[in-house]
């Protein structure tokens, strides 16, 4: 779904085995950052930057349709084991990554417990919802009316848990290629 211009700015993975390699690398990076933070007695990335003088970059992992990724329906034993490893790495990063500057953006159409495991869902500190029916709105932000009030023609408009409505940017290939 992504043209060549996005590959300059993001590492796009479509194979589960390659994804696990990346997630293992992120888990290793998390452990390395823990060691570095401990050396300077920093509780989070902001303190680490202040105390060490090192402007450590944040890392953002984004997954569009995480439900599709984690769906075990019809999977054989080997694939289920692979997906369990992926899920475990995502859960680790969701639990510990934020303080160490490693962040997850996980998108799904239906963020219920059957699709997004509690270990991951409960550790995502911000939930955003686009236009949705009452049930989905309630699942995400607890207000059965909020997300359904976004106009049908408001493409890219979202609402946060606290009721803040915002308009997302739209980046087309031409815009990206000019950077």
Stretches found by the model and what they are:
Residues 1-43, 53-142, 146-150, 160, ...:
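P-loop NTPase catalytic phosphate-binding loop
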